[in-house]
């Protein structure tokens, strides 16, 4: 039996929600280990549809514990709002199905305001932040001035911590020509929400270690995608946290040996939201067709996603940087009916051939994809639940992707419905 880490193998929006929901049926605990409420996913459980941004997928499933780890930056008001929204759908979130790391960093209103100021006022190309305060909160965490969840339980210790926080932020606000924030305002903001979120706090690393030793199955749920990793992604058009699989250990407090199987999620094509390099992006009718058939709009932002052909180079990079054991390939049905399908196998940069995307931003902008053309299929893959249901050419496409990325396809998703999944290898049985 293996614990399983699920990571996006592209730029996010790969369909992790469905796969995590499918796997969470076998898990005892589902753990969020990085990011915040800046990336959402949709879960379909029976007739109910849940849209989550911060809560782990396990909270909507009976007898499963959801855990928010220390690697997450937590907006306490967003957490309370999401809990209330689920209550309206008949899902009660209590300490029985949710625990939050006591050392998780909090996102405050000043973080959201600073995030928006920087994005809206930045000269040149924008990073594409969701303006939810994620980046500024991580900055304060690294700068050792953050307010953490456990601090709300010790209100007498808050004033000096707030003073240290505001010494930094008010200096920034003066630079922006903004009114300074009072310590009382931050204290009131924290005091007003404390009773809503403190009941969930726990020493998460200890809880997870005991669960692991007790033979519990743990599913680590990544947000966004590995190509948005602050170190290994297309910097600076990335998120503010590490999104590769190794972060599951750091962001939960479990040692790396506790991670067994790494499952990467990848679409059968490629999408990206916001700015940044995208070598295989299609600006023609084919890209439009993929976007329309795939319903490519962001769960959280509603922004239209950019669409392009499958980039085997980038997914292969993720296989290597995340140590991916197998891939869940999603949205294969979107490619039904194409006469031919193209796959990027290399890049040409100034006449030189590359099998990976260089870290240089300038080189990324000059990268021209080198394509391999694969015949399409006229039949349908939508709703297929076994290999026998797939057109022969669709199977050849999947097999070629396996060869190019250096990892097997463990699961194949053929529609948004959770049961429309072809299982080749169960990650929990590794």
UniProtKB/Swiss-Prot annotation:
PROSITE patterns, sorted: ADENYLOSUCCIN_SYN_1, ADENYLOSUCCIN_SYN_2
UniProt-recorded name of the protein: Adenylosuccinate synthetase
GO BP term, example: 'de novo' AMP biosynthetic process
Residues that hold Mg(2+) according to the record: 13, 40
Catalyzed chemical reaction(s): IMP + L-aspartate + GTP = N(6)-(1,2-dicarboxyethyl)-AMP + GDP + phosphate + 2 H(+)
Keyword field: Cytoplasm, GTP-binding, Ligase, Magnesium, Metal-binding, Nucleotide-binding, Purine biosynthesis
Cofactor binding annotation: Binds 1 Mg(2+) ion per subunit.
Binding-site list for GTP: 12-18, 40-42, 305, 331-333, 413-415
Pfam families membership: Adenylsucc_synt
Residue numbers binding substrate: 299-305
Family: Belongs to the adenylosuccinate synthetase family.
Protein EC: 6.3.4.4
């Amino acid at each position: 039996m293996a614990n399983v880490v699920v990571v996006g193998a592209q730029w996010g929006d790969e369909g992790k929600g469905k796969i995590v929901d499918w796997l969470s049926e076998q898990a005892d605990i589902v753990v969020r280990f990085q990011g915040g409420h800046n990336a959402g996913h949709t879960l379909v459980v029976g007739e109910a549809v849940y849209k989550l941004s911060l809560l782990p997928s396990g909270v909507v499933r009976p007898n499963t514990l959801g855990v928010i780890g220390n690697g997450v930056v937590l907006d306490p008001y967003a957490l309370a709002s999401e809990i209330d929204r689920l209550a309206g759908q008949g899902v009660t979130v209590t300490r029985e199905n949710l625990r939050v790391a006591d050392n998780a960093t909090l996102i405050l209103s000043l973080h959201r305001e600073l995030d928006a100021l920087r994005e809206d006022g930045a000269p040149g190309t924008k990073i594409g932040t969701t303006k939810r305060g994620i980046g500024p909160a991580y900055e304060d965490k690294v700068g050792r001035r953050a307010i953490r969840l456990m601090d709300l339980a010790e209100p007498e210790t808050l004033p000096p911590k707030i003073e240290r926080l505001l010494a930094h932020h008010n200096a920034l606000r003066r630079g922006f020509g903004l009114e300074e924030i009072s310590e009382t305002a931050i204290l009131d903001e924290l005091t007003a929400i404390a009773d809503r979120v403190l009941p969930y706090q726990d020493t998460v690393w200890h809880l997870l270690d005991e669960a692991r030793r007790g033979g519990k199955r743990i599913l680590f749920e990544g947000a966004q995608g590995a190509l948005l990793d602050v170190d290994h992604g297309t910097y600076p058009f990335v998120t503010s946290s590490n999104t590769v699989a190794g972060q599951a250990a750091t962001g939960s407090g479990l040692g790396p040996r506790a991670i067994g199987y790494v499952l990467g999620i990848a679409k059968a094509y490629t999408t990206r939201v916001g700015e940044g390099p995208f070598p295989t992006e299609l600006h023609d009718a084919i890209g439009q067709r993929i976007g329309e058939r795939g319903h490519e709009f962001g769960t959280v932002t509603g922004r239209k996603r950019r669409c392009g052909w499958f980039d085997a180079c980038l997914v292969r990079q993720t296989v290597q940087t995340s140590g991916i054991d197998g891939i869940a390939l999603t949205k294969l049905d979107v490619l039904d009916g194409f006469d031919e399908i193209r796959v990027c196998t290399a890049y040409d940069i100034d006449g030189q051939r590359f099998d990976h995307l260089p870290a240089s931003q300038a080189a990324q902008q000059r990268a021209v994809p080198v394509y391999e053309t694969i015949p399409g299929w006229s039949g349908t893959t939508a709703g297929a639940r076994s290999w026998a249901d797939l057109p022969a050419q669709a199977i050849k496409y999947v097999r070629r992707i396996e060869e190019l990325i250096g990892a097997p396809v463990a699961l194949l998703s053929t529609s948004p419905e959770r049961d429309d999944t072809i299982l080749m290898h169960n990650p929990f049985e590794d």
